[in-house]
Regions:
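Substrate-binding pocket helix/loop in short-chain dehydrogenase/reductase
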Residues: 68-69, 76-81, 178
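Active-site loop immediately N-terminal to the catalytic Tyr-X3-Lys motif
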Residues: 70, 117-123, 145-146, 204
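Active-site helix of classical SDR
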Residues: 92, 128, 136
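Residue(s) in the substrate-gating loop at a strand-loop-helix junction
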Residues: 112
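Short C-terminal tail/terminal secondary-structure segment
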Residues: 117, 181, 199, 210-223
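Short, small/polar-rich loop/turn modules that mediate ligand/substrate recognition or access, typified
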Residues: 144, 149, 209-211
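Catalytic Tyr-x(3-8)-Lys segment
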Residues: 171-193
Length: 223
């Protein structure tokens, strides 16, 4: 059973629901603004009311903006830190009492290689994703004794709606550059390239892995 959260992208959320149900699973979409703690708490209540249990939380909501230091406003900074980092913490905090009752749970945070390294022209994004890497470690250190398993994935350059603006016509030079940055010569990874790692972290096979960030970037970070 999968609860799919959305705020504005209802059609995309419903597409995910249909994909899951067509494969024989159970899924439902839930609208909530997870930049607001009351919405996180209400969403959690709705999912628990619907299905009675939450075993795994995937913190995958996020925002990415290419903005250099001198153009980063307070609003841009707060937007990225709130959605990419703050919401992840309060989602976990909201679910901890439930996991204590049922004997454990799992958290998979979606960070970025911008959190394990750094890039120019996106200081707020790097700060938010770097914070998520260390939040993963801090949560694991505190919650491991509760049988709450917390890890994260740091994707490389994955083709998503967040970076569609740099993958279209007119960006040939950028795309060519991306191919030189990995030993594999891959410019953009597919979303499906993340699924194996996510399924592993969601499974019991990862029960002895706590506080780790697994990089999936086609080899970008080896250079």
């Amino acid at each position: 059973k999968v609860a799919v959260n959305y705020l504005k992208s209802e059609n995309s959320a419903n597409d995910v629901v249909r994909e899951i149900t067509s494969a024989g699973g159970t899924a439902k979409s839930f609208k909530a603004d997870i930049s607001k703690v009351p919405d996180i708490e209400q969403l959690t209540k709705e999912v628990l009311h619907e299905w009675g249990n939450v075993d795994i939380l995937v913190n995958n909501a996020g925002v990415f903006r290419t903005v250099p230091v001198m153009e980063t406003t307070e609003e841009i900074w707060d937007e990225q830190l709130t959605l990419n980092l703050r919401s992840c913490f309060f989602f976990v905090k909201t679910l901890v009492p439930h996991w204590q009752e049922i004997g454990g749970g799992k958290v998979i945070n979606i960070s970025s290689i911008a959190g394990t390294g750094a890039f120019p022209n996106c200081p707020a994004y790097c700060a938010s994703k770097g914070g998520l890497v260390n939040l993963t470690r801090a949560l694991a250190a505190e919650l491991g004794k509760e049988n709450i398993n917390v890890n994260s994935i740091a994707p490389g350059n994955v083709a998503t709606a967040l970076n569609a603006h740099v993958r279209g016509p007119g960006n040939e030079e950028y795309i060519a550059l991306m191919k030189t940055l990995t030993p594999t010569g891959i410019d953009f990874l597919d979303v499906e390239d993340m699924t194996g790692t996510a399924v592993f972290l969601a499974s019991d096979d990862s029960r002895m892995i706590h506080g780790e960030t697994i990089v999936v970037d086609a080899g970008w970070s080896v250079w």
